[in-house]
Amino acid sequence: MPSSGDAAGRRPHVVLIPSAGMGHLVPFGRLAVALSSGHGCDVSLVTVLPTVSTAESKHLDALFDAFPAVRRLDFELAPFDASEFPSADPFFLRFEAMRRSAPLLGPLLTGAGASALATDIALTSVVIPVAKEQGLPCHILFTASAAMLSLCAYFPTYLDANAGDGGGVGDVDIPGVYRIPKASIPQALHDPNHLFTRQFVANGRSLTSAAGILVNTFDALEPEAVAALQQGKVASGFPPVFAVGPLLPASNQAKDPQANYMEWLDAQPARSVVYVSFGSRKAISGEQLRELAAGLETSGHRFLWVVKSTVVDRDDAAELGELLGEGFLKRVEKRGLVTKAWVDQEEVLKHESVALFVSHCGWNSVTEAAASGVPVLALPRFGDQRVNSGVVARAGLGVWADTWSWEGEAGVIGAEEISEKVKAAMADEALRRKAASLAKAAAKAVAGGGSSHRCLVEFARLCQGGTCRTN
């Protein structure tokens, strides 16, 4: 429990409790480094064991090796029978296993001597009660967009108001923000009995009990959503909201000595390369991969493409030639590099040769594109990615054809459509200028005295006080 000495000059000890998935884990690592290196906090990062993927294990090992000031707190999950949810996504299962193990966190927190907690949105409703038992303030790090945070905060109210009408989930008009169309609502939320829906609603209802909410965004990227959340327009009794993004990648983590993609980029002309990546979690169907390959080929542009053909860590034995169509790699070898290996995305986006990012619009990818000033061609596949694509289009960071299909919908996006969108985006100087202006705004936000920097300073100050919000 926090003592009076915490408020009298001792460094606050902030314990961060992330959930599963690189999209959740990466921003927690970045927050840990920021707080420990620039904001006078002692920081511990809870590592949940076993991890859900080898990518998570490697990321955590690299983080702790590079930043020994961030302390590691291992937390073993209680046994969990996943057969209760036979067809659930591996990450939704991990969220549930972590939620059921949360009551066991108490002894770990007591031994750590924490003065404040920050946990993931996926664990909100189960970690806040544990924090209250310990007399600790519990903040939330929301790892997606402010638009998605506003949906999470308002969705329980929306469901309550529409209960019994039998019409299912439709367009959601979020007070102070804007309308999120039915087609952009994450697929799982259309099923009231889905495991993720139950988790999402429980966590949304619990947000008003948090001490504060940090969100990885900045004012210029999401002005409406940030303002509405901070002004309490989305939900009554909402805690303080701190827009602390873009949370920047740690700068001294080890690079892969075997990687050759940077050498390839170095050999390309300035602003000539299309970078293509769809994140670490989901695979794209074979048919869609081949259409994308054909679209990139007929666009005529250079490209670096990171191909993922499996879900999580399932065996990935397929050869690239088999995945992308006969003869494709040979035909594009002089202007395209295709790899199944991990790349340092932030390093790629900062490279002067990269002119466009064809992305699924996972939120980390969006913030990294904004910080780098690289325009985005949005190709969302599932979850919050259509909401994020809407943010990209509204901010002028990129373009999104909102009629394109995504996971669970019939049809694929054709090669000709992809080719035309790539060519148009590569030729759009106004789009390039807007992306560059957002990069300047992002840099200003995180610099000393900027809006995001001030929010982190205020968060650290609150952690120093060690007070517990009890509403």
Curated annotation (Swiss-Prot):
GO molecular function: 2-hydroxyflavanone C-glucosyltransferase activity; UDP-glucosyltransferase activity
Region (UDP) location: 280-281
Reactions catalysed, as given in the entry: a 3'-hydro-2'-hydroxy-beta-oxodihydrochalcone + UDP-alpha-D-glucose = a 3'-(beta-D-glucopyranosyl)-2'-hydroxy-beta-oxodihydrochalcone + UDP + H(+)
Cited CDD domains: GT1_Gtf-like
Keyword Glycosyltransferase among record annotations: yes
Enzyme class: transferase
Family assignment from sequence similarity: Belongs to the UDP-glycosyltransferase family.
The protein's name: UDP-glycosyltransferase CGT
Primary gene name: CGT
